[in-house]
Amino acid sequence: MNESSDSLPLEELEKAPMPSIFSSLRATVSKPLQSVLDIEHYIKCNQRTEMLTQQYRKLMNVDTKLAGNIKRQSIAICPSIQFLPKGRTLEYFDKETYWLMLDYDHVISLVLDEKVEKASHSKYAMAVYRTISGKGLRILLKYMRPAGCTLTATELHLSLIHI
């Protein structure tokens, strides 16, 4: 594993490696995104993503198992790690991206638009979008390591989960 424990200043975050993208939730071959615009394209402009999202939302009320199969065909972005091209487990860890994802499910529709709008204005938010169900919110953001942090990327993320 090649996990960095170095802290990056804010200006260096712009040069940090980009997250990996997989062609589906089950794929093991990935490539790094080239830019933040790639994320926007895959989420907001990609015809395949749009088609799968529409199919998923229609099927959720009819057949949740079939809807789940549709969801697994969707692209997958791993914000925190740039993987080596062939692999999807920690043994294929290549680089830390200094990104993380906040994932909120079952957000009350009354406040969802407000939350999307508010999160979109954060200087750390790289992408803000509704989940495939239309009832959740995802925020991909950049972070800086705390000064003097010697944890590996995995240790840092695990410690944040348990706060």
Predicted regions, residues:
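DNA replication initiation on ssDNA origins
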Residues: M1-Y98
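Acidic di-acidic motifs
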Residues: E96-I108
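Histidine-centered divalent-metal-coordination microenvironment in nucleic-acid enzymes
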Residues: L102, S120, M126-L151
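Short acidic, S/G/P-rich loop/turn micro-motifs used as interaction or catalytic elements
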Residues: V107-L110, P146
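Short amphipathic alpha-helix segments
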Residues: S109-K123
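Mg2+/Mn2+-dependent nuclease catalytic core
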Residues: E155
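Conserved small/polar residues in nucleotide/adenosyl-binding loops
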Residues: I161-I163
